[in-house]
Amino acid sequence: MNDSDEFFEVLAYVRASRHRSNIIKFLAHGLKTPKEIGVELDIRTNHVSNLLADLKKKDLVFCLTPNVHKGRLYKLTDVGCKISEYLGDV
């Protein structure tokens, strides 16, 4: 499997979930906390945290403040930014 195959598998993974897609699109606008994401997208904060953990495992998001208990800041990785560009075209 080459890099483009892996990229499109990750893109399909994100598109398979409305919440994952919306989080990626929302993070394309800058740094956000799980609470900000939850309020904006109408998703419970604990569910947002689980989704962010999944997206982090796929190397789509990065936590800038991992040692902070509340108010962690998340941003998209380079791959996450590419995914958001594809989602913007959908």
Q: What are these model-predicted stretches?
A:
Residues 1-21:
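Short alpha-helical segments that sit at the start of domains
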Residues 36-40:
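A short acidic, leucine-rich amphipathic alpha-helix
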Residues 21-25, 82:
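Pre-recognition alpha-helix immediately N-terminal to the DNA-recognition helix
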Residues 43-57:
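Short amphipathic alpha-helical interaction segments
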Residues 73-90:
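Conserved segment of winged-helix/HTH DNA-binding domains
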Residues 58-69:
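Beta-hairpin "wing" of winged helix-turn-helix
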Residues 34-35, 53:
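Residues within the helices of the helix-turn-helix
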Residues 18, 29-33:
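Short capping segments at the starts of secondary-structure elements
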